[in-house]
Amino acid sequence: MDTYRPEQAWIDGTNFDAQKLFGARAEPNGVSFSVWAPNARSVRVTGDFCSWSDSAHWLSRGDLGVWRGFVPGARAGQLYKYIIEGADGSVVWKADPFALAAEVRPGTASRIHTLSYNWTDGEWMAGRRALGGPRNIYEVHAGSWRRHTDGSFYTWYELLSLIHISEPTR
């Protein structure tokens, strides 16, 4: 009897919750890291938690090419990158494609982040109108959508005043 393996299901295209499998997850005593790099010879993680040492935290390869490791003492808010040695021996420092947060430009590191927000909109959620049909959703890349006249980028807080979300009309 086959056992369900979430990583294999993701590789096969039948698991749509990859954000639960990969990335950095803060735990009480440190952070667990997980990244898919099936052709890598080795994968390390470095960051603020080890003064960006390139040899401090080696990850272990699983049979599906998923590399995992735990960094004691690492915590939310710290920056990190993966150091990936390719099959050809080349070494690249990469941001985490499943990171929940990232460093502000021009930096490119990922940021350890938690999703521990206590939502208080229960009353609003209970009273909202249910959407009974298709919706159009427009997406823009906020980092490149608009700039100040001097060429600098807007912060998220500056962009908030420009965003308009409207309720559907019937």
Where are these regions (language model features)?
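The feature marks proteins involved in alpha-glucan
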Residues: 1-32, 61-139, 143-151, 158, ...
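Residue-level detector of conserved catalytic or cofactor/ligand-binding positions
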Residues: 161-169
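Hydrophobic pocket-lining residues within nucleotide cofactor-binding pockets
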Residues: 40, 145, 168
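Short proline/glycine-enriched turn/loop motifs at strand-loop junctions of beta-rich domains
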Residues: 36-43
